[in-house]
A protein has these predicted regions:
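A short beta-loop-alpha structural element at the N-terminal edge
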Residues: 1-15
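Conserved acetyl-CoA binding element of GNAT-fold acetyltransferases
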Residues: 76-92
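A short helix-loop-beta-strand connector motif used in the catalytic cores of GNAT acetyltransferases and
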Residues: 42-54, 84
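Conserved active-site alpha-helix within GNAT-family acetyltransferase domains
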Residues: 113, 117, 124-148
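Conserved acetyl-CoA-binding loop-helix of GNAT-fold acetyltransferases
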Residues: 90, 96-109, 132
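Conserved beta-strand in the GNAT
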Residues: 54, 60-69, 84, 89
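Conserved hydrophobic beta-strand within the GNAT/NAT acetyltransferase core sheet
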Residues: 85-88, 118-122
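Conserved GNAT-fold acetyl-CoA-binding loop/helix
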Residues: 18-41
């Protein structure tokens, strides 16, 4: 089951976000992730700047997607009007079981429904996954060296 995020899911998202950041080898302390970052995500979500979808196995949250339509109001706007998957995570024990693909399709559908004909994302280690989902690796990279992938409808 995949649900839209709401503030009652804050703790669940914070737990997954902590695991996600650890996997990325981020130096952001856990208390910041569970505090200010979680508050920031709530604020951006409430303003309608980002959308968040969380996948569950029963009551257990197992994956999330944070995405937006790039526009000037957002804190990240590389390609105005494009759909952008900002953050994406599937718990390790649920990888290679189809959860990631289902959540990706769900996210893409919503972005398309919001008016995006073109999508992009950045990735450090999941390029093969995204390519299997129909995304194309571009020659461009972010200032942090992340690969940029695109998908067009």
């Amino acid at each position: 089951m995949i649900l839209d995020y709401n503030p009652s899911m804050k703790q669940q998202l914070a737990c997954m976000m902590t695991a996600y950041m650890a996997e990325l080898k981020s130096d952001i302390p856990e208390e910041i992730i569970r505090g200010r970052l979680s508050d920031y995500i709530d604020e951006m979500s409430e303003k309608g700047i980002i959308r968040i979808r969380i996948a569950f196995d029963g009551q257990l949250p197992i994956a999330f997607s944070v995405f937006q339509i790039d526009r000037q109001e957002s804190d990240w706007c590389m390609r105005p009007g494009w759909g952008f998957i900002r953050e994406y995570y599937v718990s390790p024990e649920y990888r290679k079981q189809g959860v990631g693909k289902i959540l990706a399709e769900d996210t893409e559908y919503i972005l398309q429904d919001l008016g995006a004909a073109d999508l992009y994302l950045t990735s450090t280690g999941a390029v093969p996954f995204w390519q299997k989902c129909g995304w194309r690796l571009t020659a461009a990279v972010t200032p942090k060296g992340q690969s940029i992938l695109e998908k067009h409808f």
